[in-house]
Regions:
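N-terminal donor/sugar-recognition subdomains of glycan-related enzymes
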Residues: 1-131, 136-153, 163-166, 182-186, ...
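Hydrophobic, small-residue-rich alpha-helical packing segments that form membrane-like cores
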Residues: 113, 117, 141-143, 155, ...
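Short, basic, glycine/proline-bearing loop/turn elements
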Residues: 126-131, 171-172, 223-234, 293-304
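A structural signal for short, well-ordered beta-strand segments and their strand-loop junctions
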Residues: 156, 198, 257-261, 268, ...
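Glycine-rich phosphate/pyrophosphate-binding loops
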Residues: 160-161, 168-178, 249-273
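Active-site/ligand-binding-proximal alpha/beta "capping" segment
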Residues: 205-264
Length: 379
């Protein structure tokens, strides 16, 4: 009860402990409690000790009369801890593989377009962005996207690239962070020479070597900052490609970020991806993951998703909640799962309301000189 907190804090001075983070007060009935716990557990000094988590109830009274409440609190904590650490592989294989890719990619990265140069030339030059994902709802949005492509900067997840190309839509940025080489299929036989390919430093080396017009970007992680290659960093790439698109749009200073194709759920026919997806509308990689039902777009019933997509959704909500002062996020998917901390608006309404000006045209930023690149490689 809030009254008990007030009574306790009026008799004991805990101001120093509260300010220093030794004590956190969390209201488990608050609407944003999941976001608050994610922020808490994602802090470095907290993250390191998550494996030691245990709920202690130090009063028999609460065990006797409030067992359901502390069980609920315990379940909330465990659920959000799992979201924070779900992507850790117990064998560390993924972590080692990503680090191996980074080391292999450093020569290519030094020859690519520095991320900081992109920011210096393009940041805060336009307000409206569209992030395109490859969910089942994308196909119905493509005609309108084509009509408005000159009035919004388009960030395209690699899996949606083929669908856009077939409609004659040229994205400004294409994002990729796959540590496997499956994504090579998304880029083969493409005519596009003007999009900027934004790649994570852990992207599979085969794809990094294959692509032109690329920027290989370091993650905002202390491990990568130790290389002192500051021209090529730093950004939160997240754990799925659309997350990378959103953080890139935020880094470039966009104020209105519209999302389409961001279903994060199966459609009524059981499709995982949009028509035209390179691996098929029913991608086999999604079939064997544990399923659950979540609230649908616009609150209209429920849709079927799986735990990986659900993790992505929660992490996006965390990202949007943390950046709601910097940008307005519009969910114009018109399908899939509801994503909190976004305004649900039809794509047509978004276009008519926001996309009234032509976007600026940019030359591709230049890479470092060979001399500068060689010096950095020697370091």
């Amino acid at each position: 009860e809030i009254e008990l907190f007030i009574l306790a804090l009026s008799t004991i001075d805990l101001s120093e402990e509260l300010c220093s983070g030794k004590i956190y007060l969390v209201d488990i009935e608050e609407e944003r409690v999941d976001i608050q716990l994610l922020i808490l557990f994602d802090m470095k000094d907290m993250f390191e000790y998550l494996s030691l988590y245990e709920m202690f109830v130090n009063n028999v009274y609460y065990k006797k009369f409030y067992e359901d409440v502390w069980h609920k609190a315990d379940e909330l904590c465990e659920k959000n801890i799992k979201v924070v650490i779900r992507n850790l592989n117990s064998s560390l294989c993924i972590g080692f593989e990503c680090y191996s890719h980074l080391l292999q990619n450093i020569p290519s990265m030094l020859e690519s377009i520095p991320f900081q140069r992109i920011l210096s030339e393009r940041k805060n030059k336009f307000e409206n962005a569209i992030v395109v994902s490859a969910g089942p709802s994308l196909a119905k949005q493509l005609p309108l996207l084509k009509a408005y492509q000159d009035k919004a900067v388009i960030f395209c997840a690699d899996g949606a690239l083929s669908m856009l190309e077939k409609e004659g839509i040229i994205p400004d940025y294409v994002t990729n962070l796959d540590f496997t080489d499956l994504a090579m299929k998304f880029f083969q036989n493409k005519e596009n020479k003007t999009s900027l390919n934004m790649l994570s430093c852990a992207t599979h080396p085969s794809l990094v070597h294959f692509l032109d017009n690329k920027s290989v970007v370091l993650r905002d992680d202390p491990l990568y900052q130790r290389f002192n290659l500051n021209d090529f960093g730093y950004i939160d790439t997240g754990t799925h490609v659309s997350h990378f698109s959103y953080t890139l749009a935020l880094a470039l200073g966009f104020k209105n970020i519209i999302m389409i194709g961001q279903d994060l759920a199966f459609d009524e026919e059981g499709n995982s991806h949009s028509k035209g997806f390179d691996f098929g509308e029913k991608f086999s990689g999604e079939e064997n993951i544990d399923k659950l039902k979540v609230t649908a777009y616009a609150g209209k019933g429920e849709v079927l998703t799986h735990i990986t997509w659900n993790d992505y959704r929660i992490k996006l909500e965390y990202l949007f909640a943390c950046n709601e002062q910097k940008a307005k996020f519009y969910n114009a998917t018109e399908g899939g799962a509801r994503i909190n901390f976004t305004e649900e608006l039809s794509f047509k309404e978004c276009c008519e309301k926001l996309l009234t000006k032509e976007k600026p045209q940019f030359e591709l930023p230049k890479s470092l000189t060979k001399n500068r690149s060689d010096k950095l490689l020697v370091k």
